[in-house]
Amino acid sequence: MKPNVFFENDTVVLRAPRAFTPNVLFESGQCFRFYPKNEEKTRYGGVAHGHYFEVELRGEEILFPNMTEKAFSSTFRDYFDLDFDYDACILSFPKDEYLRSAVRSCGGMRILHQEPFETLCSFILSQNNNIPRIRSLIEALCAAYGEP
């Protein structure tokens, strides 16, 4: 099922959190510019496509506080691949034990549509490194050479 999206007081709200789990997504090593904002790892802040934003899991909802409908629709709906129905995809391979095991351990993962150059740099930096070191290298590059 695709997440149900609605807008409420400068906050984007997604229902269907099973299809989107922030800590699984941001701690997976797929992206390196998001950091937990609380000890429970239910709120993350980070940069994507030149914008800082926060994502919070609250009960049955995923919140994007201080985000306009325009910013969400023009950039972040695609970034988080929200128009793809991951549940339907998962149901299409019920007999593959390897894939079922991956879904059990990484439920809520999405494929991020990241900027190609940042993805390339992240991949190069990831060789023979761990996630904390990759994050610090990417932050150093962004601070030194990124746009203000």
Language model: regions and residue ranges:
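HhH-family (HhH-GPD) DNA N-glycosylase catalytic core used in base-excision repair
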Residues: 1-148
